[in-house]
């Protein structure tokens, strides 16, 4: 979706943007300061006769758009020329102190048939709570407006990335994935106490848990998909897992075919960085027909097991051969329980590098490599 940049100097409701926004019924977009229930803008007069919007409805919500409609008293309805829409992130609903004044949350739209689509990645982010209120207005010949009182304030939350958005993100990840290297095991590092607890309280079986908030804010798997994190990247010179880890000094290594085989499906989950040169790709492996598989089918792009840029499983010489992308760090989520007896647990000889942990890591919203233009 192409969205024009906003003018750097937005002063009054009379100053239009340089271009109209595609698929957006907002022909003029600019700041319209609001304090309390009535507009205090110097170019706006107040007039009780204009109908006040009520029974506001929000529908067709995506990660960067929504439709809005409302009911109005028919009195003076034919005098309405514009709608003023006050859109704020929920935490800012009682404040008009904005860090970036060129990013409008007060929108002026020509009066069009309802519902009206509001779209724009420069003021809407995925999975974010917003408040919205509406005024009706009548533009006068001198450029001033007469306006109604503000409607009630309602709240809504934008959606996660769709498969279309994730496919765009995946294509950016494919561009830097690099050549494929062989690997033979998936591995997971934790503290010794973790593995002791698994043996004593879970019958030697690691259980899936909810994914944290790391990665893209709009990723549909964050805090929703249950799984177990594994790594598979290898050192270039040895072809083996690295000796260091940020997650603990004990490591379980599981033969790759135990988790990744023709009876599993593979999905792309996310692509992000943490203000460093390293980029991370999250992949999901789900046994066919499992609850995790059903979750991913509805939300994530599915990858071919044998032909993709990140992680492959191919049949060669009567056995399975595995490859992983060299130039990105793969984080693999396996959606079913894993028995420790499938592999081996041992202490690593390297160091625990806590600074490399991605637990609840925040994505760099300014990185051009791993962001798409539908929020961060």
Curated annotation (Swiss-Prot):
SMART domains to which the protein is assigned, alphabetical: FN3
Source domain of life: Eukaryota
Domain Fibronectin type-III: residue ranges: 52-161
Role this protein plays: May play a role in the development of the central system.
Family: Belongs to the PHYHIP family.
UniProt-listed PANTHER family: PHYTANOYL-COA HYDROXYLASE-INTERACTING PROTEIN-LIKE, PROTEIN CBG15099
UniProt protein name: Phytanoyl-CoA hydroxylase-interacting protein-like
